[in-house]
Amino acid sequence: MAFPVISTYRVQMRGRSNGFGFTFADAENLLDYLDDLGVSHLYLSPILTAVGGSTHGYDVTDPTTVSPELGGSDGLARLSAAARSRGMGLIVDIVPSHVGVGKPEQNAWWWDVLKFGRSSAYAEFFDIDWELGDGRIILPLLGSDSDVANLRVDGDLLRLGDLALPVAPGSGDGTGPAVHDRQHYRLVGWRHGLCGYRRFFSITSLAGLRQEDRAVFDASHAEVARWFTEGLVDGVRVDHLDGLSDPSGYLAQLRELLGPNAWIVVEKILAVDEALEPTLPVDGSTGYDVLREIGGVLVDPQGESPLTALVESAGVDYQEMPAMLADLKVHAAVHTLASELRRLRRCIAAAAGADHPLLPAAVAALLRHIGRYRCDYPGQAAVLPCALAETHSTTPQLAPGLQLIAAAVARGGEPAVRLQQLCGAVSAKAVEDCMFYRDARLVSLNEVGGEPRRFGVGAAEFHHRAATRARLWPRSMTTLSTHDTKRGEDVRARIGVLSQVPWLWAKFIGHAQAIAPAPDAVTGQFLWQNVFGVWPVSGEVSAALRGRLHTYAEKAIREAAWHTSWHNPNRAFEDDVHGWLDLVLDGPLASELTGLVAHLNSHAESDALAAKLLALTVPGVPDVYQGSELWDDSLVDPDNRRPVDYGTRRVALKALQHPKIRVLAAALRLRRTHPESFLGGAYHPVFAAGPAADHVVAFRRGDDILVAVTRWTVRLQQTGWDHTVLPLPDGSWTDALTGFTASGHTPAVELFADLPVVLLVRDNA
C-alpha cells in the first residue's frame, strides 16, 4: 500500500568501503527519529549498483541490481518494511540519463561494447559516435597520445596503470600498441577534445544512455519497476531530465511503468520566465524554482545598488555580466563540448544536405540566445525561432550557418535532439559551473535555478508563483538544500543578510583589502562572502573548517576559470590564494570578522527560520536535506555530503529548544495531521497593515493554517513594528511553535515576540 507523500527527508547513501558510510541498515535505524520529526517519506540518493566506493551513487554501473555496498535487495526490502510499519514510505533518486564507465570492468554493458564493438548486444544502449573514429569508439583516457606506447597485454586485457580494457576475441597477439590498433576502441589524449560517445556534460566517466530505445528503457528500468510492483517504493526523483533525447516520451513510459499513483518529480532547471511543461505526466519539479523564490523574497532590494558598486570597485562592470555569460556559453560549446559540437555539425550537414565552415560558429552563437536548458517542450515552441532571429540580427555574417541549422531542425530528428542536448550541457557548464563562481555581488543568489542579476523576488511575485503552484503543481517538491546546491540553506541565509547592511560589508571589505589584499580583488570578494557565511559565531576555526575552506577556495577559483582551471591549473595563483586564506584565518581580520558575524547572526538566524518555515508550508511537498534540522554550514559538494551527527539531533528533537528543529518538527507534524490543508488547500496571501507591513510575508493554507514570517530585520530593529498588525481571519488561532493565541487584528509586536515566524492553526480545526 502506497502512502501519500506529505514530506520527504533526503539522505545520501554510501557504502562503507570508502571511509564512513550510510547503508540501508543505517537508514532503518533512523526511521524512529524521522517518524518523530514528522517525516512521511525517507528519500534515498541513487541506490543501484555504482562504481565501487562511489560517494554519491550517480555513477551507476549496473542498473539491474541494488547496490550490494548499501545492503542489496534484501536490505532495501527490510528498510521498506520497517518504514511501512510506521506508516512511512520510500522515495528513490533514479539516474536514467547516463551510467558510470570510469572503471570499464565494473560496467558489463560498456565492457561488452568495448570488447565486441558494433556486434555487441549493448551497442545500441549507448549514444556512440561510430563515425568519429572510423568505426572505433574514441576513448579520451590518456594524458597524451604517446601513452599508447605504454600499453601492455595481460591475457585478454590491455592495461595502462590502473586502466584495464578488454581485448576483442582473436586480437590479442603482439605488443600493446599493436593489439590496441585491432580493438573496437581507440585511446587518445584527453586534450584533443575528442570523445566517441555522449557524456553527462563533459564528464568522460559518465556515458549517456539511449532511453529513447525501448529495449534500453526496459533493461535499465526493470529493477525500478520491481520496487513498485512489490510495493517497496512510493515515488522517484528523475535526475537530469534534460539530458535525455526525448524527455516527454521518457516520462510517458515511466508513468506507464510505475503507475498513476507513483509520485514522480523531475530535476528540471527552469529559467525565471519558464514554467514547468504542463503536459508532463509528473507531480512537479525538484524545487529549484521554489528555492529561488524563497531566498529572493528575503533579500532586501535596498542593497542592490551599493553591493553592485562594491563589486564594481574590484574592476567588474556588472552591466557586462550578460555578455560575459554569453561568451562563456560559446567557450563551452567550442572548447569544453567540442566533440559534441562536431557531431552536431555532421548531423545538421547531413540533414540539410550541405555543410558550411560557419556552421559551428553559428551553433555556438545561437546557444548564446537560448536562455534555458532546452526549448523543445510544447510550451517553449517560440524560443528557438526567436533565438534564431536574434542570432541573425546580432551576427548576420553567420547567416549561411544559421540557415542550415533552421533547415535541419525544422525536419526534427537527430539534429533537433542533439541541439537541445548540447544546449543543456552548454548552459550547465557556463552558468552553474563557471558564472556562479564569478558573480561576486551577492553570492547567495548564485544558486541552481537562480538568476543573480535579478536582485531578489518581490512579495507580489512570490505570492503569485505560490498560488500558481497550488493550482497547477500542488505536489511538486519544495526545498532549500540539495546535494547540488552551491551552499547550504543557512549559509545562504547569512550571506543574504548582507543585502540589508551593504555599507557595513563594504567597510569590512575595504579594510580587509587594505590589510590582507587578495591575489585578485573579485576573487577576494567572492571568497570573503563564503567565509562570512560559514564563520563560527565563536570565532574558533577548527582544523576541519580550515581544510574545508581551502578545498572550497580551490574548487571555486578553478570553476571560475579566470586565473586557473581544472584543465590548466595555475599553481602559483592557487598557492597565492591558499596563502591569503591562511592570512585571513589567522591574522587580525579574524577577530573583526567574528565581531561582524556576532553582530549579524541573529538576523541571519531569523532569515534562516523564515526560509525554512516558508519551504515547509508553501504549496508543494517539502524536502529536508540531511542534517539541516540544526544550523548547517555546508558549502558545495562534496562538503554537503559529510556524515551527519544524528545523536545530537535526536537530543535536540526531544528538547525542542533549538529554534530550527522546533520550527521543522512543528510544521512537519502539522502537515501530517492536516494534509488536506497543505496538499489540496488553496493559497491565499495575507497582508499586514501599518508602517512595517513590508517586513511581513504571510499567507493562508486552506481554511485553518496561517503562516507569517518576518524579513529585513536589520531595518526592523531600527524602526520597530510601530503599530503594524496582521489581520487574522475569523476565529481564534494558536501558534504551533509557541502556544500564543490570537484573534482579529493582532499586533505584530505580540505575534513575533518569541520567534520571527509563526505557524497559526485555527482552534478546533
Curated annotation (Swiss-Prot):
GO molecular function: (1,4)-alpha-D-glucan 1-alpha-D-glucosylmutase activity
Assembly and oligomerization: Monomer.
Pfam families with a match to the protein in the record: Alpha-amylase
Function description: Catalyzes the conversion of maltooligosaccharide into the non-reducing saccharide, maltooligosyl trehalose (alpha-maltooligosyl alpha-D-glucoside) by intramolecular transglycosylation.
Domain of life where this protein originates: Bacteria
Protein name as catalogued: Putative maltooligosyl trehalose synthase
EC primary class: isomerase
Key words, A-Z: Isomerase
Biological process, per Gene Ontology: alpha-glucan catabolic process; trehalose biosynthetic process
NCBIfam families reported for this sequence: trehalose_TreY (TIGR02401)
Entry's EC annotation: 5.4.99.15
Metal-binding found in the keyword field: no
Name of the gene encoding the protein in the UniProt record: treY
InterPro entries in UniProt: Glyco_hydro_13_cat_dom, Glycoside_hydrolase_SF, Maltooligo_trehalose_synth_4, Trehalose_TreY
Catalytic activity: 4-[(1->4)-alpha-D-glucosyl](n-1)-D-glucose = 1-[(1->4)-alpha-D-glucosyl](n-1)-alpha-D-glucose
Alphabetical list of CDD domains matching this protein: AmyAc_MTSase
Gene Ontology CC terms, in alphabetical order: cytosol
Family label: Belongs to the glycosyl hydrolase 13 family.
Record PANTHER family: ALPHA-AMYLASE FAMILY MEMBER, MALTOOLIGOSYL TREHALOSE SYNTHASE-RELATED
